[in-house]
Amino acid sequence: MSGEDGSEPRVFSVLRGEALRTRSGPFGEVGTLCSAGGIEVAWVSKHGEQVDPDWFRPDQVDVLLVVQGQLKVEFESAARPDRVLAAGDVLVLPAGCRCRAYRWPRDAAEATIFLAACPAGQDGR
């Protein structure tokens, strides 16, 4: 969902403006919104990037909230079914589960944006 003039969605400019720091890579863009009291809240944007071949493994519980678009979360373990989340959906990732997330469907026109809350300093690789 882009602006009427073809510009990026307003949510992007708001999130970028509020971010303490941002970083971009081949798997998306991440901006840290808050890091206090041992908790870090970040926004993640996925728009046509590659799917990360590595698995993410949170050391502690992570909470994801989809703001825009759809997000597919694949789990390494066949015991956990893959999930497709839409705007407004929340997913709790248990500590130690191995997963990866990407925009769904892969050829969607709009970016997927989600918020992630986790313990500060967690890398998950």
Give names to the regions the model predicted.
Residues 86-87, 95-124:
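Ligand-binding loop in jelly-roll beta-barrel domains
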Residues 33, 55, 82-83, 91:
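Short secondary-structure boundary/capping segments
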Residues 1-55:
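A short, N-terminal "cap"/entry segment at the start of jelly-roll beta-barrel domains
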Residues 43, 68, 75-77, 103, ...:
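Residue-level recognition of conserved beta-strand positions in structured domain cores
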Residues 51, 72, 81, 89-91, ...:
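Histidine-centered metal-chelating micro-motifs
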Residues 57-87:
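A short beta-strand-loop-beta hairpin characteristic of the jelly-roll/cupin
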